[in-house]
Amino acid sequence: VPNKNELEKMANLLIEGMESGCLGLSTGLVYEPGRYSVSNEIIELAKKIQKYDGVYVSHMRNEAEGLIESIIETANIGLEANVKVEISHLKSVGKSNWGKSEQALDLIEKFSDDGLDINMDQYPYTARSTMLKALLLNDTFNYENDLSPMGKSMPNEVLLCSVPNEKSFEGKTLEDIQKLYDLPIIETVNKLLDDVSDKILVAAFGMNENDVQNIMKNDLTMIGTDGIDVGSKPHPRAWGTYPRILEEYVDRLGILTLENAINKMTHMLLRNLE
């Protein structure tokens, strides 16, 4: 937690950014170093973007068993700072959390109905794209309990997308590497990070298609992605998000009309960043 002087320096940097044309404040509360931030710290910073009509965008603290609490935290930051809120990549991760999308959407809609300018974005896949190190630090591979801010994924559900220094591992699953190393899963991941690279990108399955569709249909949901197109087997959201929406969810499944899909991919995004 920053002291008063450190928080003031952070605020000044934020103001400098807003004066230079930035659109708001973004946090990644499952990643280093954002995972150590507390709500009061973020509220004080978010207050600095209010006069610029900035937006607070958050990759929330917990997208699994703590999903509801994280939505409340995110919304309260917006309320306390009097700023717009966007939830990044709304999802409910881990089989024990499948079905929570309905409760999550009801809660977000209530905040919206009560006057908070809040919405969310989503990518149309059941696998997330992230750093292997982040999954390890968030207890994804500790199967003794359901506690993990990023949800649980089994070794066969984690695909290695980019492996610096060992391209032959790209396209393999953690289960493949675990068999190669003949080690328990956590030791396998640690060996990969220590001996090969600590910058391994993965695609980790863990969401349910019904939740994806429920979130997609909501009037507050925008479609977008920040996927990283590196490695020989990158997560397809880096280039396939919009084609997948049109082919799978408009043409094949009819989850969205063409007009609604285009609105979610264009006008809604622009309106949120005005």
Can you name each region flagged by the protein language model?
Residues 187-193, 258-266:
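Short, well-structured alpha-helical segments that form the helix of a local strand-helix-strand
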Residues 1-3, 81-83, 91-227:
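Polyanionic/metal-chelating signatures
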Residues 32-36, 63-67, 93-97, 126-131, ...:
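Flexible loop/turn segments at secondary-structure boundaries
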Residues 200-212, 253-263, 270-274:
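Acidic, glycine-enriched loop/beta-strand segments at the rims
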Residues 47-55, 76-86, 110-117, 252-258:
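Secondary-structure transition/capping motifs at alpha-helix termini
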Residues 227, 235, 246-262:
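Generic long, charged, amphipathic alpha-helical segments
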Residues 21, 59, 121, 182, ...:
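Divalent metal-coordination and catalytic microenvironments
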